[in-house]
Amino acid sequence: MPANLSSALETFKRQRDAAEAHYLKANRVSVFFREYTAAVETLLAALWVEHFQNSALCLMAVGGFGRGELYPCSDVDLAVVSPAPLSDGIQEQIARFVQTLWDCKLMPSVKSGSVGELCESVRDDITGDTAFLEARFLFGNRQTADELAKKMNAQRNVAAFVEAKLVEMEHRHAKSQGSGAVLEPNIKSCPGGLRDIHTLLWIAKAQGLATDLPDLLKQRILTRAEAGMLSHGYRRLAHIRIHLHLNAKRAEDRLLFDLQPQVAESMGYEGLNLRRQSEELMRVFYRAIKTVKQLGGILTPMLQSRVSSTPLRVTLRIDDDYIQVNNQIAARHTDIFFRRPEHIFKIVEIMQQRNDITALEPQTLRAWWGATRKINRSFYQNSENRHRFAGFFRNGNGLTQTLRFLNLYGVLGRYLPAWEKIVGLLQHDLFHIYPVDDHILTVVRNVRRLALDMHSHELPYASALMQSFEKQDILYLAAFFHDIAKGRGGDHAIQGIADARQFAADHFLTEEESDLLAWLVENHLLMSTVAQKEDIQDPSVLDAFCKRVQTHERLSALYLLTISDIRGTNPKLWNAWRASLLESLFHAAGRYLTGNGGNPHTLFGRRRQEAADLLTRAAVPEKQQKKLWNALGSAYFARHQSREILWHAANLVHDFETPIVRSRILPQSDSFQVMVFMPNGPRLFARLCRIFSRHGFDILAARAFITEHDYILDTFIVQIPSQHAPEDYPDIQSALEAELNSFIHGHTVAEISSHSRRISRRSRYMPIAPSITITPEEDYPDWYSVEITAVNRPFLLADMAEVFFAHNVSLRYAKISTLDERAEDSFTVFSPDLNNPKIQSSLKQTLLEQLS
């Protein structure tokens, strides 16, 4: 590199470093952009003189560089423009120029061509056209740059451009779905992100409007308050993106788990642990994108209406205060929301009641939103407002859209201060993927869908139950309040009771309705906990559950709320296995509350008789049946449900000395049930678990049982890896059975491979502290319940089983609850040694070492 260019490069590096240092000290986005852009332009000036002195070409900054918004590791968008088609020599010259840019580590993105060629290239390319919309002359022939800008603007169909940018935004938002996009959002492309701000400004610029906020204010596109909010939201997002680039040292626009704590710390969130720093950063981020979405709801239709060829304007009278304009509702006088604040809810009530109205007219929305910022205690105390707010839930129609609209514009938080505390609040527990407010509204949506015929195909039984449930509005309210006390420290289910009862008292609920609402909030985790962590075949478990529930109404409401809550936590959590667990508990509890099935001896006897009837119909002699029952022992009927007993009996009755493996695909499920019967021996359970893990199966439940003649009868429910289609299941089943058969006959040893304990990025950087509790079982000496919470990973259950074996603890039952990347496992174990506190402490310590 020539000496003069080396000097220019060194100057650039000093200016770039100075811009970064100045930014980290002063924290001013606009100053950083100005200084860093100037540094790049200084280097480009030297390179241009070296390659194109006295040339007819011109160099233009386009895209982000063109608008002067250059982030530390962003591409430098450029266009080399010629008044005439490029000769081979000029093209080679441009190629050398671009290579020099790469040598200088500028990450260039360069378009080149004549004015005509470049205009033609963007004619059907909305991205290219957008880049040139922000073109800015740098060096060379200014006349060529002016000609390009003039022709680009002349050929642009503004209405088509606006429509294309809005469609592009819709597609971008649609892609930003799923747990990855929520937990590690792309600050540039997510809904409400920087690209949405750019889109608004592009639409304005294409119409010939100035795109700096003061000018948009003068042109009455923005109000003063809106300009301030948009500027604040933009600066927040730009701050985060600058720090993200500086910490990642690359053009990374995703707030990855491993970068969140670094970005938070560099932005000054000090005095907090890494998790709290990350949560605070993400809360700031979510509030910023919420502001952008709020303003987009007003500005997008307003800007679009300036150029779009709208259908014939149809205006209908609604009442003295409102008219309908096409599918929007408009206030006759927009100051009505300030003069008569009760109309803040009234217009929403009208919109909820009428399916032909889908939105507020932009100027009405602007006035309404401005008035909502005046919501205070006196607004809440107005009985008319409280009646209307409760009416949103009683009506039910469009409830999800209504609540999301009120949340987007901050009304829920102003009306209910408890709600404001959970807006944008993230939970780093490895299974929730939404901020608390979004999660709650998703749960409300799920409950509401159960009430609608059009969605009955999703969950037919639950939908039928919901549609016959009399107090649907209380269920909606329970969904709304179930997590409202998150983030306060302590038990949110208990703390939420007071919020629910206060709301009920203020919003004219009856005592009976208030009691049901408060009970559901307090117990919203009860059913999922019992179904996923406890042995619901154990009559004592069912008895304790039903003593908490007490009535069929509570049982139905809790079942519907639990389904909706799990489905609204993380799409990965809901599966056929969880559905069957909840449904089994629901039906068992229903029988118990009706007076059927509560006596343990009656229950065990019925299970045994059902199996005996099956074997008798299969012509199995009674003598042979008794031999089987004696081998299994009476405890067997306490630990297994009827369907398992029938399956085991049919496979074992003719020969209960020969080891066997059997499996079956569970109906309407992506899971296998597997039984393994073989002589007892050391570490068998752990080694079986390793086989399942090696095949990529998630173990959903496991029941370890030892017969009277010292055989193991272990039963597993395992989930098939998600990449397999149902038509692959028989082949997968055959391969699994083949390896298990080889194992039980002593031909293979199932051991772990060295590379299989890898965990996700989320689990590495947002881990949960493992916890272990060991509790003696009442009325059963030497039996214990072991509860474990830890980061989920391959071979976890096998490793824990190894620890139990090493401490002479016999594992008899395992209930596995895998919540995405979090494992909450329950074990029933037998060990006289655990009476010794030292041995119990040693077991805990070894388990913790294995889990950490």
Curated annotation (Swiss-Prot):
GO terms for molecular function: [protein-PII] uridylyltransferase activity; phosphoric diester hydrolase activity. The keyword GTP-binding does not apply. Keywords: Hydrolase, Magnesium, Multifunctional enzyme, Nucleotidyltransferase, Repeat, Transferase. Coiled coil: none annotated. CDD domains: ACT_ACR-UUR-like_2, ACT_UUR-like_1, HDc, NT_GlnE_GlnD_like. Pfam families: GlnD_UR_UTase, HD. Its cofactor is Mg(2+). It catalyses: [protein-PII]-L-tyrosine + UTP = [protein-PII]-uridylyl-L-tyrosine + diphosphate; [protein-PII]-uridylyl-L-tyrosine + H2O = [protein-PII]-L-tyrosine + UMP + H(+). Residues 436-558 form the HD domain. GO terms for biological process: regulation of nitrogen utilization. Residues 1-318 are annotated as: Uridylyltransferase. Residues 319-672 are annotated as: Uridylyl-removing. Residues 673-757, 785-852 form the ACT domain. Gene3D superfamilies: Hypothetical protein af1432. The keyword Nucleotidyltransferase applies. Has four distinct domains: an N-terminal nucleotidyltransferase (NT) domain responsible for UTase activity, a central HD domain that encodes UR activity, and two C-terminal ACT domains that seem to have a role in glutamine sensing. Modifies, by uridylylation and deuridylylation, the PII regulatory proteins (GlnB and homologs), in response to the nitrogen status of the cell that GlnD senses through the glutamine level. Under low glutamine levels, catalyzes the conversion of the PII proteins and UTP to PII-UMP and PPi, while under higher glutamine levels, GlnD hydrolyzes PII-UMP to PII and UMP (deuridylylation). Thus, controls uridylylation state and activity of the PII proteins, and plays an important role in the regulation of nitrogen assimilation and metabolism. PANTHER family: BIFUNCTIONAL URIDYLYLTRANSFERASE/URIDYLYL-REMOVING ENZYME, BIFUNCTIONAL URIDYLYLTRANSFERASE_URIDYLYL-REMOVING ENZYME. Belongs to the GlnD family. This is Bifunctional uridylyltransferase/uridylyl-removing enzyme.
